[in-house]
Amino acid sequence: MLTIADHEFSSRLFTGTGKFARPDLMAAAVEASGSRLVTMAIKRLEPGKRHDDILTPLLALGVKLLPNTSGAKTAAEAVFAAHLAREALGTNWLKLEIHPDPKYLLPDPIETLKAAEQLVKEGFVVLPYCGADPVLCKRLEEVGCAAVMPLGAPIGSNQGLVTRDFLAIIIEQARVPVVVDAGIGAPSHAAAAFELGADAVLVNTAIAVSRDPVAMGRAFALACEAGRSAYLAGLGARGLQASASSPLTDFLEAL
């Protein structure tokens, strides 16, 4: 079980809701993945927009909703969006996203820290999407964030753990859960994040744009379980020199 703030999750795979062809396909993929925490953009909560009703199928699944502030370019915009989400969904949980650059969608560290500090004081459970910066992640932890969500690679890029070495430092130093978010494009990437010691991963694009999102959701669930189990079991040390698994020295000397 994974505990974030006051909530326990039976799955360490968190999922998103964007880029799916249909809401029912999104819901089926989420169910197949076993995910119990699902993030959704606040800007998609438009009353009367029935053709993009993602809320109803998610509520039917009984998952915990994590509204995000995607689209916010400043701390002020993110705080405003957070208030809207709390009013609309009745939750104080929030994935904080502030990325002013529309091309690479890299998070703004200064505005993110500023918004996080204010939102924590207002009683929000803040999970900030941020760069793989160990210093920033520690600062976010210190201001009261319930978890940190450093990126593996730019959003939707499917590049995997480009920031692997920095993620390892963040995981080593963190006293709150570390959720690797963004850039995870294959189940093997998710497994690698868990092998590093990550507490959870968030996956959206890789599932949503696959030929079979339901099957891909299931594949990610299996990969997350495998990676986590490998981490707990203890991976063997890497080395440049060979080490025979079945030495024959005694046998050969006896001939």
UniProtKB/Swiss-Prot annotation:
Pfam families: ThiG (PF05690). It is found in: Cytoplasm. The active site is at 95 (schiff-base intermediate with dxp). One of its GO terms (molecular function) is thiazole synthase activity. One of its GO terms (biological process) is thiamine diphosphate biosynthetic process. Its EC number is 2.8.1.10. The keyword Cytoplasm applies. 1-deoxy-D-xylulose 5-phosphate binds at residues 156, 182-183, 204-205. It catalyses: [ThiS sulfur-carrier protein]-C-terminal-Gly-aminoethanethioate + 2-iminoacetate + 1-deoxy-D-xylulose 5-phosphate = [ThiS sulfur-carrier protein]-C-terminal Gly-Gly + 2-[(2R,5Z)-2-carboxy-4-methylthiazol-5(2H)-ylidene]ethyl phosphate + 2 H2O + H(+). The keyword Cytoplasm applies. It comes from the Bacteria. GO terms for cellular component: cytoplasm. Homotetramer. Forms heterodimers with either ThiH or ThiS. Catalyzes the rearrangement of 1-deoxy-D-xylulose 5-phosphate (DXP) to produce the thiazole phosphate moiety of thiamine. Sulfur is provided by the thiocarboxylate moiety of the carrier protein ThiS. In vitro, sulfur can be provided by H(2)S. Belongs to the ThiG family. This is Thiazole synthase. It comes from Aeromonas salmonicida (strain A449).
